[in-house]
């Protein structure tokens, strides 16, 4: 399951993200964070961490360095 999730994220990074303006407020970017979270914690917990991170990434939220726990 992790391989499928990672493949979907990498597809986004290679095929969709280059067409969008940069807008992530964090380092690493949300998609890179998602890859690291899935690799470290597996598809379910890593996916949940990635969704929470994406939910925090908005113009009125905080910014800065936010590593995978």
UniProtKB/Swiss-Prot annotation:
Q: Where are the transmembrane segments?
A: none
Any one GO CC term of this protein is: plasma membrane
Give a yes or no for keyword Cell membrane in this entry.
yes
The membrane-topology field of this record reads: Peripheral membrane protein
Subcellular location per the Swiss-Prot or TrEMBL entry: Cell inner membrane
Give the residue range of the signal peptide: none
* Subcellular location, principal: membrane
What NCBIfam families does UniProt report for this protein, alphabetically? membrane protein insertion efficiency factor YidD
Query: Which protein family is it in?
Result: Belongs to the UPF0161 family.
Q: What is this protein called?
A: Putative membrane protein insertion efficiency factor
Supply the source organism for this entry. Answer: Laribacter hongkongensis (strain HLHK9)
